[in-house]
């Protein structure tokens, strides 16, 4: 397949390594999969929630931080959905290698970034927006003037990708499954072009 021509520092592309199918892999047998993929409604929710939060930050309305508030931004793009990013994210989500990032997810167009989220409940499957909010909440630990560092990256890296100004497109894959009686929702979002370059500001201060 065409993805076998895309190499990332010698590592095979996810779609080359695991194949073109988005069906759950045999690794998923340890859980009970109930749905694969995002619905049209969920796609809209994902894009709208990212843009709502990006605009909130860009307008200087995010009061949280370490220290807060976050400065306003002058260069924040509005994100649009990208089906190819979503497809590659879904191939990876369907491997059930939970909480691990894949090694090569780029497209011919983009270097691609990634966020992963998980939530579970006994009552109902956690909604897709609640998973994105987990990423946004990392803003509480972010110091804009310090930026992304090796030390803080694990605490703030999802937030910084969500609001990385130069990112233009997002596409996500998801699986819902039951494990030990818990209704679990696992979300992988891919971003193009990627954010989270150390030493670069996440956006230009207004």
Curated annotation (Swiss-Prot):
Q: According to its UniProt record, in which tissues is this protein expressed?
A: Expressed by the venom gland.
CDD domains xref list: CAP_euk
Using the chain's own numbering, where are the disulfide bonds?
Answer: 4-16, 8-104, 28-96, 172-189
- Any GO CC annotation of this UniProt entry: extracellular region
For this UniProt record, give its keywords in alphabetical order, as a comma-separated list. Allergen, Disulfide bond, Secreted
Per UniProt, residues of the SCP domain are 48-191
Q: Would I find Membrane among this entry's keywords?
A: no
Q: Which Gene3D superfamilies match?
A: CAP
Q: Where does it reside?
A: Secreted
PROSITE patterns xref list: CRISP_1 (PS01009), CRISP_2 (PS01010)
Family according to the record: Belongs to the CRISP family. Venom allergen 5-like subfamily.
What this protein is called in its record is Venom allergen 5 2
């Amino acid at each position: 397949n065409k993805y076998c021509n895309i190499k990332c520092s010698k590592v095979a592309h996810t779609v080359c390594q695991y194949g073109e199918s988005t069906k759950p892999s045999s690794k998923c047998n340890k859980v009970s999969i109930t749905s694969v993929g995002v619905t049209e409604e969920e796609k809209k929710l994902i894009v709208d929630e990212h843009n709502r939060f990006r605009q909130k930050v860009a307008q200087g309305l995010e009061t949280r931080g370490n220290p807060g508030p976050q400065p306003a931004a002058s260069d924040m793009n509005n994100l649009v959905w990208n089906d190819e990013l979503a497809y590659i994210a879904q191939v990876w989500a369907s491997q059930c290698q939970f909480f691990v990032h894949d090694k090569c997810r780029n497209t011919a167009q983009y270097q691609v970034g990634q966020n992963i989220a998980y939530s579970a409940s006994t009552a109902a499957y956690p909604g897709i927006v609640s998973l994105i909010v987990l990423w946004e909440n990392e803003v509480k630990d972010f110091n804009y003037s310090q930026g992304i560092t090796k030390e803080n990256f694990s605490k703030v890296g999802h937030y910084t990708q969500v609001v990385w100004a130069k990112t233009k497109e997002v596409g996500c894959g998801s699986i819902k499954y039951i494990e030990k009686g818990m209704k679990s929702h696992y979300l992988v979002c891919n971003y193009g072009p990627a954010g989270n370059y150390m030493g670069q500001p996440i956006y230009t201060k207004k």
